[in-house]
């Protein structure tokens, strides 16, 4: 017999001001590391961009770090999948304004798009192993394997400014240790939910 401790949740709201929510939430979730060290997720409502474009975070594979239950793949497949995503965006009338590769499998795009998000999301996620983590004008959802400090450093979250955020540190009890199973989740296919 022993104590079972699982998962930790933290959130913050700053009314009327923009602050470094990435760093604040990282510190809060790191204090909850004992509640769930397997994966950590951040839902950050940042400043958005001045043009009002969509910010899309997505992955084309899984993190196969120590402790992961994901199947190891040849990393060259990630580039192929990313090119397929780019083609779908163009074919749907979207324009990639800015693209960042954050890990071998994870990306952040700023996109001009003014059509149906459901159609867009289905097309992007039709690419094998591809999942949109978030899409919105201010919401950015980041999740990966590791504690809050590891994930924050990997994605540069300590630089994100905004008004509110919620996060989750996870102990995998009934599903695999992978990004797909990490929390929180995007309200597919709605912007900023």
Question: What does each model-identified segment do?
Answer:
Residues 2-193:
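N-terminal segments that mediate ammonia production and transfer
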């Amino acid at each position: 017999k022993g104590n079972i401790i699982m998962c930790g949740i933290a959130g913050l709201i700053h009314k009327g001001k923009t602050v470094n929510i990435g760093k604040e939430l990282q510190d809060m979730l790191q204090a909850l590391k004992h509640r769930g060290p397997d994966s950590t997720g951040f839902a950050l409502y940042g400043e958005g961009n001045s043009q009002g474009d969509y910010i899309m975070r997505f992955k084309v594979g899984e993190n196969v770090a120590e402790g992961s239950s994901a199947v190891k793949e040849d990393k060259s497949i990630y580039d192929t999948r990313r090119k397929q995503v780019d083609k779908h965006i163009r074919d749907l009338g979207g324009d990639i304004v800015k693209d960042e590769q954050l890990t071998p499998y994870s990306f952040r795009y700023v996109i001009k798009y003014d059509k149906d998000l459901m159609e867009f999301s289905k097309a992007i996620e039709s690419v094998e192993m591809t999942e949109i983590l978030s899409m919105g004008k201010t919401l950015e959802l980041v999740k990966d394997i590791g504690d809050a400090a590891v994930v924050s450093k990997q994605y540069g979250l300590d630089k994100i400014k905004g008004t509110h955020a919620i996060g989750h540190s996870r102990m995998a009890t009934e599903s695999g240790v992978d990004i797909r199973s990490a929390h929180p989740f995007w309200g597919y296919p709605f912007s900023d939910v």
